[in-house]
Design a protein with these regions (language model features):
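Structural core segment of the AMP-binding/adenylate-forming
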Residues: 1-27
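Motif- and composition-driven signal specific to adenylation
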Residues: 19, 30-191
């Protein structure tokens, strides 16, 4: 296990487990990077996402640190009541922008992230994870809900606090039918 932290991190919060601690303030090249202006740092790429967009032609789109920060701030401004005790689902391909927030946001809270392996049948594995680990937060697509709609009567997820619906337009009727399966969840349209 490796723990990345800065010099001002209170390390007592991590217990006495066996961690390899890396102080990012002491990494080689740190002094040089601190000489760069804040604005130029924000303009640096955080990652590149590949999308076909409306053209159907795959292209790489650079996402700057400022873009990522804005996306993260917008996501966290939704006033979730989430913390390190929550268990969150990340089911999206890493080429989809929601995957970045679905992975990074929970980790910044200290929450657990559960992912669907590429070898699994995604739509069934999602609900297996939600049920088995009593996940508290999930973002899914309306297509996934539509595919599983014949099984709504068998799905009971009382631990789910938030259900984000993303990637495409949602049908109100479909969401209302699914509401019985997630009686304690607040629905959030993230499309």
């Amino acid at each position: 296990r490796t723990l990345l932290c800065t010099s001002d991190t209170d390390r007592s919060a991590f217990g006495t487990g066996h961690f390899r601690i890396i102080d990012t303030d002491r990494l080689p090249g740190k002094a040089q990077s601190e000489q760069q202006s804040h604005s130029s740092d924000e303009e640096r790429n955080a990652y590149i996402i590949f999308t076909s967009g409306s053209t159907g032609e795959p292209k790489g789109v650079p996402i700057t640190r400022a873009n990522l920060n804005a996306f993260y701030r917008a996501y966290s401004s939704l006033d979730w009541n989430l913390d390190e005790h929550d268990r969150m689902l990340q089911m999206f391909e890493l080429t989809f922008d929601v995957s970045v927030v679905s992975l990074l946001y929970p980790l910044t809270l200290g929450a657990a992230v559960y992912t669907v392996g590429h070898q699994d049948v995604k739509h069934f594995k999602v609900f297996e994870l939600l049920e088995k680990y009593q996940l508290t937060f999930a973002t899914v697509t309306p297509s996934l809900l539509q595919l599983l709609s014949p099984y709504f009567d068998e799905i009971n997820l009382p631990s789910l606090k938030y259900l984000g619906v993303s990637a495409e337009a949602s049908q109100t009727e479909l969401l209302e039918r699914f509401r019985k399966s997630v009686p304690n969840a607040t629905f959030i349209n993230l499309y």
